[in-house]
Amino acid sequence: KIYEQCEAAREMKRLGLDGYDGYSLGDWVCTAKHESNFNTGATNYNRGDQSTDYGIFQINSRWWCNDGKTPNAKNACGIECSELLKADITAAVICAKRVVRDPNGMGAWVAWTKYCKGKDVSQWIKGCKL
């Protein structure tokens, strides 16, 4: 499913991401935009470590989920990576909350560091009926 921006914002808010671990809803929407363009079905294979990034937040199979093919995977979220590709983003949000609790916080996402960190991320939810 490809979410519209405000639709994604509403879902993320409903699932408790606004203010989670000190990050605003705008941070999460900005990150999802630059990671997957709000596409829950997005996958990207990383040749270097043979891992794959999954879903709206592009969560990686080396650390966070099990896809049965990533060498030395940790599965810290305790889920199948396929759960992260569903139209319903509940599992992706639960796992993203686990990711952000790590010391790196949202720095775990290259897109957040590059496009959202230190920026006015409120623009990502402007005009959305939340």
UniProtKB/Swiss-Prot annotation:
Q: Which CDD domains match?
A: LYZ_C
User: Which Gene Ontology cellular-component terms appear in the entry?
Assistant: extracellular region
Alphabetical GO biological process terms: defense response to bacterium; killing of cells of another organism
* Enzyme class, first EC level, given as a word: hydrolase
**What reaction does this catalyse?**
Hydrolysis of (1->4)-beta-linkages between N-acetylmuramic acid and N-acetyl-D-glucosamine residues in a peptidoglycan and between N-acetyl-D-glucosamine residues in chitodextrins
Taxonomically, the superkingdom here is Eukaryota
Q: Which InterPro entries match?
A: Glyco_hydro_22, Glyco_hydro_22_CS, Glyco_hydro_22_lys, Lysozyme-like_dom_sf
> According to the UniProt record, which cysteines are disulfide-bonded?
C6-C128, C30-C116, C65-C81, C77-C95
UniProt keyword list: Antimicrobial, Bacteriolytic enzyme, Disulfide bond, Glycosidase, Hydrolase, Secreted
The keyword Secreted is annotated on this UniProt entry: yes
Localized where?
Answer: Secreted
Thermal dependence, as annotated: Optimum temperature is 40 degrees Celsius. Retains the bulk of its activity after incubation for 1 hour at 90 degrees Celsius.
The segment(s) forming the C-type lysozyme domain are 1-130
**Gene Ontology terms for molecular function:** lysozyme activity
According to its UniProt record, the EC number is 3.2.1.17
Question: What does the record note about activity as a function of pH?
Answer: Optimum pH is 6.0.
Active site: residue positions: E35, D53
UniProt similarity note: Belongs to the glycosyl hydrolase 22 family.
Q: Any idea what job this protein has?
A: Lysozymes have primarily a bacteriolytic function; those in tissues and body fluids are associated with the monocyte-macrophage system and enhance the activity of immunoagents. Has strong bacteriolytic activity against M.luteus and V.cholerae, weak bacteriolytic activity against P.aeruginosa and no activity against A.hydrophila.
What else is noted? Answer: Lysozyme C is capable of both hydrolysis and transglycosylation; it also shows a slight esterase activity. It acts rapidly on both peptide-substituted and unsubstituted peptidoglycan, and slowly on chitin oligosaccharides.
Could you describe the subunit structure of this protein?
Answer: Monomer.
| Protein name per Swiss-Prot or TrEMBL | Lysozyme C
- Which organism does this sequence originate in? Amyda cartilaginea
Gene name, Swiss-Prot/TrEMBL: LYZ
